[in-house]
From Swiss-Prot:
Species of the source: Pseudomonas paraeruginosa (strain DSM 24068 / PA7) (Pseudomonas aeruginosa (strain PA7))
Entry's Gene Ontology BP terms: regulation of DNA-templated transcription
Protein name, UniProt field: Probable transcriptional regulatory protein PSPA7_4544
Molecular function terms, GO-annotated: DNA binding
Pfam families assigned to the protein according to its UniProt record, in alphabetical order: TACO1_YebC_N (PF20772), Transcrip_reg (PF01709)
Cellular-component GO terms for this entry: cytosol
Keyword NAD attached: no
Localisation: Cytoplasm
Keywords, comma-separated and alphabetical: Cytoplasm, DNA-binding, Transcription, Transcription regulation
NCBIfam families assigned: PRK00110.1, PRK12378.1, YebC/PmpR family DNA-binding transcriptional regulator
C-alpha cells in the first residue's frame, strides 16, 4: 500500500516539538509513573511500561530520569490520584478530534479542554460523538532508507495488519492494538528498530484541508497539546504535502 503518510502528517513541524521538549518530558514522565503504578516497575513484565521507556529513550530522556519516574510510580501514592480521560469534539470545518488526558483534577482538565475548543472555533462533543470514526492501532514508523522488501516480509511474518510505503520513502507498519507489542518486538529482534513506535488512533475516513482550514485546525491542536494534562491529540485531518509546506 502506498501513501503520503496522511495518518502521520499531524505530527507536524518537528522543530516546534523539539522546542517544547520540557513539556514533552513532563508527559513522558507522567506516562512512566502511571504505567509503573498500574503494571509494576519491571519493563519486561509490563508492556505499557516497556513502550513508555522506549519512547522516553527515543526522546533522549536520561536513564536516571526514567528510573526515578518508575520508582515514583511503584513507591508513591501520587499516581493513585491520576485518572485517564478522553474527550471528543470537532475542530473548524467538522474535523474530528480525540483528546487523551491524564489528570488528578477532572474539572480543571475538562474546563481547559472546553476552553481550547471554544477559543479556536471548535466544539467539544459528547462521549462517542467521533470515537466511532477512529480505530486504535499500533504504528511503527521507519525513516527513508530501510530495506523495503525485507521490512515488509518481516512485518507480515510478525503479524502486522498493513505496511504503508510513503511517497518520501518512509514506511509505516500498522498492527492491531492487541498485537502491537509482539509485532514491534519481533521487528526489533529481526533488526528493524522503528524510529517511532506507538499506539495511536487511526481515522476510518479523513478530511482533506486547504491552507486556511489547516491553520485553524492546527491552532486548536497546538493549544490542546500545550495543556499540561493532555497526553495525546488525534484528528482525521489530512493535510496535503503542498499545504504542509506552506505552513512551514
Amino acid at each position: 500500500m502506498a501513501g503520503h503518510s496522511k495518518w502521520a502528517n499531524i505530527k507536524h513541524r518537528k522543530e516546534r516539538q523539539d522546542a517544547k521538549k520540557g513539556k514533552i518530558f513532563t508527559k513522558l514522565i507522567r506516562e512512566l509513573t502511571v504505567a509503573a503504578k498500574q503494571g509494576g516497575g519491571v519493563p519486561a513484565d509490563n508492556p505499557r511500561l516497556r513502550l513508555a521507556v522506549d519512547k522516553a529513550l527515543t526522546a533522549n530522556m536520561t536513564r536516571d530520569t526514567i528510573d526515578r519516574a518508575i520508582a515514583r510510580g511503584v513507591g508513591s501514592n501520587d499516581a493513585d490520584n491520576m485518572v485517564e480521560l478522553s474527550y471528543e469534539g470537532y475542530a473548524p470545518s467538522g474535523v474530528a478530534i480525540i483528546v487523551e488526558a491524564m489528570t488528578d483534577n477532572r474539572n480543571r482538565t475538562a474546563a481547559e479542554v472546553r476552553h481550547a475548543f471554544s477559543k479556536c472555533g471548535g466544539n467539544l462533543g459528547t462521549d462517542g460523538s467521533v470515537a466511532y470514526m477512529f480505530e486504535r492501532k499500533g504504528q511503527i514508523s521507519f525513516a527513508p532508507g530501510v530495506d523495503e522488501e525485507a521490512l515488509m516480509d518481516a512485518a507480515l511474518e510478525a503479524g502486522a495488519d498493513d505496511v504503508v510505503v510513503n511517497d518520501d520513502g518512509s514506511i509505516d507498519v500498522f498492527t492491531t492494538f492487541a498485537d502491537f507489542i509482539s509485532v514491534n518486538e519481533a521487528l526489533t529482534a529481526a533488526g528493524f528498530k522503528g524510529d517511532e513506535a506507538e499506539v495511536t488512533m487511526i481515522p476510518s475516513t479523513t478530511a482533506t484541508l486547504d491552507l486556511e482550514t489547516a491553520q485553524k485546525v492546527l491552532k486548536l491542536i497546538d493549544m490542546l497539546e500545550d495543556l499540561d494534562d493532555v497526553q495525546n491529540v488525534y484528528s482525521n485531518a489530512d493535510i496535503p504535502d503542498d499545504v504542509m509546506a506552506q505552513l512551514g
